């Protein structure tokens, strides 16, 4: 299970003099994790994407000199999950405005690079809007939106393939991939006895449908994939593989 470490400098745990000293000593980067509050099948908590975003951000910060991790934004753009109780969601323009407002304040106290790290694919439109505005309104702030944060990345899928986990099992939502990661991060929040397969076809073929009609049109239980073979140890490997790929992309 993950625990906080001095190598994962959470901004919210620092005092203002500590932040000032960190910036003076070269901490010029902030990683802003973006999650969601939405259903993740009958077995995972609504905050799954937020927990995953925080974990990825900390792992990425450990690989990036001078990086601080901002508190995760726990509500994203999740209207495709309408019909499942517990949903909290923002319009894309609202989330983009929140990101821009936070970035302005960061730039004012010395941040010169912002990493937008989303663990929820539905945040894509808001992130694109935010990046467009930031590049126009804060040209001195370098903004990085990783290509691999909006979908299962090749690094995690490679780990799955080594274990004999097919992409249809790994899934796009609450499948083996996310369930394994939550078993590593917060096993106390996983209702393993309730885990069951959902849609298990080719994931790429349903993306358009779920974006237009919502997940309920594709999977009544909210699962895209099959969590039955999820394992905590593999979840740790997924997270490390994702973070390594992100760091490689950023440092290229």
Residue ranges of model-derived segments:
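Extended, histidine- and acidic-residue-enriched regions that form the cofactor-binding/catalytic faces
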Residues: 1-115, 119-252
């Amino acid at each position: 299970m993950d625990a906080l470490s001095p190598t994962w400098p959470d901004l919210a745990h620092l005092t203002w003099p500590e932040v000032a000293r960190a910036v003076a000593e070269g901490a010029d980067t902030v990683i802003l994790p973006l999650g969601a509050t939405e259903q993740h099948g009958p077995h995972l908590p609504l905050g799954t994407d937020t927990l995953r975003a925080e974990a990825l951000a900390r792992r990425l910060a450990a690989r990036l000199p001078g990086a601080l991790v901002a508190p995760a934004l726990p509500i994203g753009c999740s209207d495709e999950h309408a019909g499942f109780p517990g949903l909290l969601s923002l319009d894309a323009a609202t989330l983009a405005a929140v990101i821009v407002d936070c970035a302005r304040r960061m730039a004012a106290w010395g941040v010169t690079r912002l990493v937008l790290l989303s663990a929820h694919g539905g945040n894509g439109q808001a992130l694109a809007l935010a990046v467009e505005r930031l590049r126009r309104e804060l040209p001195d702030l370098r903004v990085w939106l990783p290509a691999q944060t909006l979908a299962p990345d090749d690094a995690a899928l490679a780990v799955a393939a080594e274990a004999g986990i097919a992409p249809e099992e790994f899934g796009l939502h609450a499948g083996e991939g996310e369930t394994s990661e939550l078993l590593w991060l917060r096993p106390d929040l996983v209702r393993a006895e309730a885990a069951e397969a959902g849609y298990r076809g080719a994931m790429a073929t349903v993306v358009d449908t779920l974006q237009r009609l919502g997940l309920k049109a594709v999977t009544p239980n909210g699962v895209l994939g099959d969590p039955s073979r999820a394992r905590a140890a593999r979840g740790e490997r997924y997270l490390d593989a994702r973070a390594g790929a992100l760091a490689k992309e950023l440092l290229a």
